[in-house]
Swiss-Prot record:
Keyword Hydrolase appears in the UniProt entry: no
Lineage: Bacteria, Bacillati, Cyanobacteriota, Cyanophyceae, Synechococcales
Keywords, sorted A to Z: Cell cycle, Cell division, Cell inner membrane, Cell membrane, Cell shape, Cell wall biogenesis/degradation, Glycosyltransferase, Membrane, Peptidoglycan synthesis, Transferase
Protein name: UDP-N-acetylglucosamine--N-acetylmuramyl-(pentapeptide) pyrophosphoryl-undecaprenol N-acetylglucosamine transferase
Organism: Prochlorococcus marinus (strain MIT 9515)
Gene name of this polypeptide: murG
GO biological process, one term: regulation of cell shape
Length: 364
């Protein structure tokens, strides 16, 4: 029988950048708490959140145009009252959230009921909810030390960003990945894919395959439109995979967006990368994230409006230029990027956050 007053609500929805850190934490604390998950209808939540977590969803979306600002506030207000009912019904004792639109009404509802909230901010530049609602939270956990400068009115704790458990153990290369001697590239655009990266990369494929690159291309759920069928034993395309940890650990180079989750996965796996920040990210936070790696020589940062077929081909040619070292061929620039990545320290963030959450468990 579950104990009274040991109920944890996780509020996380939308993109993998919000959901995956929350999942990593939930797996660490699930044996101590009765788990409940608050998300948004028709989003990634239903695909990744385990059924045992009692997934609750709201019909809540984020209008993108300024004309809908009033509508946004009305939706937040309406959702706040719905969440108050949920918090009371489930007897929630603590809320953990990772930001995003679902977080705002959840924080307000919890505050009105005097329920403590812990929010985690993965990005270097805080998101809107963290920036304006963080002061209402018991703690704001930050993924990067420098984020503290933007949250002067909040009780911040530097924890790093939690990663899924598989990133902390050695994983073999999946059987479906092309075998061979050529360098292995992982091309991906985050949980939602990246249409522009896909389009430009398709244009470069013929030459890259001829140059003996092995390629795993994660195109995203809504970016599967291929201009032509690509036939090669060295190329595999998938909408999505849950084996990202294994792919990143065993690849030579990652080509990706620069969400906070991806940045921390690259730091953990020590992999060099080409980063193309999402141009419409709020406060340009993806570019700021990418600079963390490019500034130490572990990544090459290129803005989306600058990428082209020529850029991909010339950049990869430069990174994988062979230099003989005592008779043994090496990739001089790639090896240098790998060494630079080793200078970054990865944190066991999930354990830190687990201890903070369980501190509140002891108080009940």
């Amino acid at each position: 029988m579950s104990k009274e007053r040991n109920n944890l609500l996780i509020a996380a929805s939308g993109t993998g950048g919000h959901i995956f850190p929350a999942l990593a934490v939930s797996k660490e604390v699930e044996k101590y708490w009765n788990m409940h998950w608050l998300g948004v209808e028709k989003r990634l939540d239903s695909k990744f959140v385990p059924r045992k977590y009692n997934l609750l969803t709201l019909n809540l979306e984020t209008p993108q145009k300024s004309i809908f600002i009033l509508f946004q506030y009305l939706k937040i207000l309406y959702s706040t009252f719905n969440i108050i009912k949920i918090l009371k019904e489930k007897k929630i004792n603590l809320v953990f959230t990772t930001g995003g639109f679902i977080s705002a009404p959840t924080i307000l509802a919890a505050k009105l009921l005097n329920i403590p909230v812990i929010i985690h901010e993965s990005n270097l530049i805080p998101g809107t909810v963290t920036k304006y609602f963080g002061f209402l939270c018991e703690f704001v956990l930050i993924g990067f030390k420098d984020t503290n400068a933007y949250l002067k009115n909040c009780k911040t704790i530097f924890t790093g960003t939690p990663l899924r458990p598989e990133f902390y153990k050695t994983n073999p290369l999946p059987e479906w990945v092309p075998r061979g001697k050529g360098p292995l590239l992982i091309v991906m655009g985050g949980s939602q894919g990246a249409k522009r990266i896909n389009e430009i990369f398709y244009e470069s494929l013929d030459l890259l395959i001829k140059q003996n690159f092995r390629i795993v291309h994660i195109v995203g759920e809504h970016n599967i439109n291929i201009p032509r069928k690509i036939k090669s034993n060295n190329y595999v395309q998938k909408k999505f995979t849950n084996q990202i940890a294994s792919l990143m650990q065993n690849c030579d180079l990652v080509i990706s967006r620069s969400g906070a989750g991806t940045i921390n996965e690259l730091i953990q796996t020590k992999k060099p990368s080409i980063l193309v920040p999402y141009p419409n990210s709020k406060n340009n936070h993806q570019e700021k994230n990418a600079i963390i790696l490019s500034s130490i020589g572990g990544a090459i940062l290129i803005n989306q409006d600058k990428i082209s077929k020529v850029f991909f081909q010339e950049t990869l040619k430069r990174i994988f230029k062979v230099k003989k070292n005592k008779g043994k061929p090496t990739y001089e620039i790639l090896d240098l990027m790998k060494e630079n990545m080793k200078n970054l320290t990865s944190l066991k963030s999930t354990n830190k956050i687990k201890n903070l959450i369980n501190y509140f468990l002891k108080e009940f």
